[in-house]
UniProtKB/Swiss-Prot annotation:
<dbReference type="InterPro" id="IPR018107">
    <property type="entry name" value="Na-dicarboxylate_symporter_CS"/>
</dbReference>
<dbReference type="GO" id="GO:0005283">
    <property type="term" value="F:amino acid:sodium symporter activity"/>
</dbReference>
<feature type="transmembrane region" description="Discontinuously helical; Name=4">
    <location>
        <begin position="122"/>
        <end position="160"/>
    </location>
</feature>
<feature type="transmembrane region" description="Helical; Name=3">
    <location>
        <begin position="81"/>
        <end position="103"/>
    </location>
</feature>
<feature type="binding site">
    <location>
        <position position="401"/>
    </location>
    <ligand>
        <name>L-aspartate</name>
    </ligand>
</feature>
<dbReference type="InterPro" id="IPR001991">
    <property type="entry name" value="Na-dicarboxylate_symporter"/>
</dbReference>
<comment type="function">
    <text>Sodium-dependent, high-affinity amino acid transporter that mediates aspartate uptake. Has only very low glutamate transport activity. Functions as a symporter that transports one amino acid molecule together with two or three Na(+) ions, resulting in electrogenic transport. Na(+) binding enhances the affinity for aspartate. Mediates Cl(-) flux that is not coupled to amino acid transport; this avoids the accumulation of negative charges due to aspartate and Na(+) symport. In contrast to mammalian homologs, transport does not depend on pH or K(+) ions.</text>
</comment>
<feature type="topological domain" description="Cytoplasmic">
    <location>
        <begin position="252"/>
        <end position="260"/>
    </location>
</feature>
<dbReference type="GO" id="GO:0005886">
    <property type="term" value="C:plasma membrane"/>
</dbReference>
<feature type="topological domain" description="Extracellular">
    <location>
        <begin position="31"/>
        <end position="41"/>
    </location>
</feature>
<dbReference type="GO" id="GO:0015183">
    <property type="term" value="F:L-aspartate transmembrane transporter activity"/>
</dbReference>
<feature type="transmembrane region" description="Discontinuously helical; Name=7">
    <location>
        <begin position="298"/>
        <end position="320"/>
    </location>
</feature>
<keyword id="KW-0769">Symport</keyword>
<feature type="binding site">
    <location>
        <position position="405"/>
    </location>
    <ligand>
        <name>Na(+) 1</name>
    </ligand>
</feature>
<feature type="transmembrane region" description="Helical; Name=8">
    <location>
        <begin position="392"/>
        <end position="412"/>
    </location>
</feature>
<feature type="topological domain" description="Extracellular">
    <location>
        <begin position="104"/>
        <end position="121"/>
    </location>
</feature>
<keyword id="KW-1003">Cell membrane</keyword>
Length: 425
C-alpha cells in the first residue's frame, strides 16, 4: 500500500516522462536485437488498453462537457459583455487551429513514417462532399449519433440542448425551472464523474505510454524520434506565434501594452505551464486580472467561462497532430477535411475540460470527424505516438489557453471602460 501511495502521489507529468524515456530505450534495444514481435505480443496490449480507456471516455465527455459549457452562458449575463467575449473566444480558437494546420504543412511531421501495422496499410474512405458534411452535422437521431460515436452531430445536439436548458432555467414557471436545473445537475454530475475517471486513467498513462512507445520504437526505430520532434517544434512555434501575432496584436489595437500585460500575466502563465490545468490555474488567473486593474464584474464572468470554452492552445495542437497522424498513414487531407478540423476543433474547445489529459481525448474526437477512427490499428499506432509526448505538449497549450483568457478579458474590460488606467493600458 505504501508503494502504491507513493506512486499515486508522484507527479503524473514526471511519471509519464519516465515511461516515455524507458519505453523508447526498451523499444529501441529489443527492436535492434530482433524482438519486435515479442514487444507486439506481450507489451503492446498494455498500450492498447490505455487507448481503449481513452476511447471509452470520448463521447460521454464530449456530450456532458458541451451541454454544461453551453448552459454556462446565461442569457441574463450574455448581453454586450457576453457576446464580445464569446465572439473573441470562437474567433481566436478558429485562428489557432488554422495556425496549427499551417505549422503542420510547414514542418510536415509524420512524413518520414510509413505505418503498416500487421503489414496492412491504412485505407482511407472517400471523403464526402462538403455540403453533405455540413448537412450531417444535424442528427436525425441524436442518441444514435452519440452511441455510434458520430462527433459533429453529437456536438450540435449537445450545444442546442445546453442552450435550451439555459433558457428553461430562466423560465417564470417554477416547475419548468426546477426540471431544467435537475437535468443540468444530472449532466453536470456525469461530466464531473467523467473528469474523475480521466484522472484515474491518467494514473495508468505512464504504463500505457511505456508500452505504446516501446512498440512504436521496436517497429519503426529511431526515425520516430525525429518526427515527434517535428510535432513538438510545430506546436511550440505555433503557440508562440499565437501569442505574438494574435494576442499581442489585439492588445496593441485596443491600446493595451503587451509587455506590461505579459509581466502581469506571467504568474498565471507559469502556473498553467506547470499544472497543465486551466481550471486549476483559475484562482491565480483571477488574481492576476485584478492586479491588471480589470473590474471584478468583468473577470468574474469572462475567466471562468474561458476556462470552460476557450482552448486556443488545444485547438492549435489538434490541427498539428491530426496532420501528423494523416502523414504517418500516407493519407492526404482534403480541403473539406481541413475545414472539418477547424470546425470540430473550435466546437470541441467548448467541451474540452480544463484538466490535464483532456486535450488528447478531444483529439480522438477530431480524428473521428475526418475519417481517422482509432478502431483502425494504424490510426491507433500513430495516435499512440502523440500520447507519448502529450504531457510535453500539454504544458505549452495550457499556458496559451490561459493567456488567451486573460487577453480577451483585458480587451473586453478596455472596451467597456472597466480597465484601470496606468496599469497595463
Amino acid at each position: 500500500m505504501g508503494l502504491y501511495r507513493k506512486y499515486i502521489e508522484y507527479p503524473v507529468l514526471q511519471k509519464i516522462l519516465i515511461g516515455l524515456i524507458l519505453g523508447a530505450i526498451v523499444g529501441l534495444i529489443l527492436g535492434h536485437y530482433g524482438y519486435a514481435d515479442a514487444v507486439k505480443t506481450y507489451v503492446k496490449p498494455f498500450g492498447d488498453l490505455f487507448v481503449r480507456l481513452l476511447k471509452m471516455l470520448v463521447m460521454p465527455i464530449v456530450f456532458a462537457s458541451l451541454v454544461v459549457g453551453a448552459a454556462s452562458i446565461s442569457p441574463a449575463r450574455l448581453g454586450r459583455v457576453g457576446v464580445k467575449i464569446v465572439v473573441y473566444y470562437l474567433l481566436t480558437s478558429a485562428f489557432a487551429v488554422t495556425l496549427g494546420i499551417i505549422m503542420a504543412r510547414l514542418f510536415n511531421p509524420g512524413a518520414g513514417i510509413h505505418l503498416a501495422v500487421g503489414g496492412q496499410q491504412f485505407q482511407p474512405k472517400q471523403a464526402p462532399p462538403l455540403v453533405k458534411i455540413l448537412l450531417d452535422i444535424v442528427p436525425t437521431n441524436p442518441f444514435g449519433a452519440l452511441a455510434n460515436g458520430q462527433v459533429l452531430p453529437t456536438i450540435f445536439f449537445a450545444i442546442i440542448l445546453g442552450i435550451a436548458i439555459t433558457y428553461l432555467m430562466n423560465s417564470e414557471n417554477e416547475k419548468v425551472r426546477k426540471s431544467a436545473e435537475t437535468l443540468l445537475d444530472a449532466i453536470n454530475g456525469l461530466a464531473e464523474a467523467m473528469y474523475k475517471i480521466v484522472n484515474g486513467v491518467m494514473q495508468y498513462a505512464p504504463i500505457g505510454v511505456f508500452a505504446l512507445i516501446a512498440y512504436v520504437m521496436a517497429e519503426q526505430g529511431v526515425k520516430v524520434v525525429g518526427e515527434l520532434a517535428k510535432v513538438t517544434a510545430a506546436v511550440y512555434v505555433g503557440l508562440t506565434l499565437q501569442i505574438l501575432l494574435v494576442y499581442f496584436v489585439l492588445l496593441k489595437i485596443y491600446g493595451i501594452d503587451p509587455i506590461s500585460f505579459i509581466k502581469k500575466a506571467k504568474d498565471a502563465m507559469l502556473t498553467a505551464f506547470v499544472t497543465r490545468s486551466s481550471s486549476g490555474t483559475l484562482p491565480v488567473t483571477m488574481r492576476v486580472a485584478k492586479e491588471m486593474g480589470i473590474s471584478e464584474g468583468i473577470y468574474s464572468f469572462t475567466l471562468p467561462l474561458g476556462a470552460t470554452i476557450n482552448m486556443d492552445g488545444t485547438a492549435l495542437y489538434q490541427g498539428v497532430c491530426t496532420f501528423f497522424i494523416a502523414n504517418a498513414l500516407g493519407s492526404h487531407l482534403t480541403v473539406g477535411q481541413q475545414l472539418t478540423i477547424v470546425l470540430t476543433a473550435v466546437l470541441a474547445s467548448i467541451g474540452t475540460a480544463g484538466v490535464p489529459g483532456a486535450g488528447a481525448i478531444m483529439l480522438a474526437m477530431v480524428l473521428e470527424s475526418v475519417g481517422l477512427p482509432l478502431t483502425d490499428p494504424n490510426v491507433a499506432a500513430a495516435y499512440a505516438m502523440i500520447l507519448g509526448i502529450d504531457a510535453i505538449l500539454d504544458m505549452g497549450r495550457t499556458m496559451v489557453n490561459v493567456t488567451g483568457d486573460l487577453t480577451g478579458t483585458a480587451i473586453v474590460a478596455k472596451t467597456e471602460g472597466e480597465l484601470e488606467k496606468g496599469v497595463i493600458a
